[in-house]
Regions:
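Acidic, PIN/NYN-like endoribonuclease modules and their adjacent C-terminal/linker elements
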Residues: 3-6, 25-80
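Acidic, metal-binding active-site segment of PIN/NYN-like and related structure-specific nucleases
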Residues: 9-27
Length: 80
C-alpha cells in the first residue's frame, strides 16, 4: 500500500520516485522524509521516463542535498 511504501522509505531516508499523485499529496501533507521526485509525465513510455531521469540527474542530486526540500517535480517540459 502507499502507506507502507511511504513509511518504509521514511524509516530508511529513501527518495521516492513516482508518477502516483498520492505520493505528491502525501509530500504536501506530511513533508519530508521521505523526499519525493514526482514524475508529471502522463502515459510516457519507459524510455522517455529513463531519458527524463538521466537528463535531470544534476537537479535530482541537488534536490536530495537540500535538507528543507520535500518534493521535486519533473515533467516532459524538462527534456531538451
Amino acid at each position: 500500500t502507499d502507506t507502507f511504501i511511504w513509511e518504509y522509505a521514511k524509516a530508511r531516508e529513501y527518495v521516492l520516485v513516482s508518477k502516483d499523485n498520492d505520493f505528491r499529496q502525501r509530500s504536501f501533507q506530511f513533508g519530508a522524509p521521505p523526499k519525493v521526485v514526482w514524475l508529471h509525465v502522463g502515459n510516457a513510455t519507459t524510455s522517455v521516463i529513463l531519458r527524463l531521469l538521466r537528463e535531470s540527474q544534476r537537479d535530482i542530486l541537488r534536490f536530495v542535498q537540500q535538507p528543507e526540500a520535500a518534493m521535486l517535480v519533473l515533467g516532459l517540459k524538462d527534456l531538451p
